[in-house]
Amino acid sequence: QPGLAGVPALVERARRAGLPVTLRMEGTSAAVAEGVALTAHRIVGEALRNVLAHAGPATALVRITVGGGVLTVEVVDTGRGPRRPPDRIGHGLVGMRERVALYGGILRTGPAPGGGFRVYARIPLDPAGAVPA
C-alpha cells in the first residue's frame, strides 16, 4: 500500500534482495496528507532501489519522522557513494525533488558523512503554499 503504511513492505523487499536495512518511524502519521505520505513512500522506494543498484555492499537506514509540523524522510547507506559526476543527476532523484517541491518541501541528496549516500526530504504538513498534486 503506497503511503507511510507501505514503507515497511518496501524495507522488507530490500532486505529480501540482500540489503540489510534498519527502519525507524517516529511520530503519528494521522496528520500526514495522502499526497505527502505517497511522496514519502516513493522517496523511500527510489532511494532503496538506488542503494541496491549503485552502492555495492552496503547497509541502509530509513528514518521517517513526523513532528513539529513537518515530515522528514532520510535514507542513508554505507555504500561506495556517488559515482556519477555531480552535474549528472539521475531521473529518480529529479522525480523525488519535483514531488517534494509540490508540497513546499526540500530534498537534499549527496555523499553521506563517513561515506555512502544520503537522501533527505523535509516536507511541511501544512499544505499552505503547496501546489496541488
Where do the language-model regions lie?
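Glycine-rich ATP/GTP-binding catalytic cores of kinases/NTPases
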Residues: 1-133
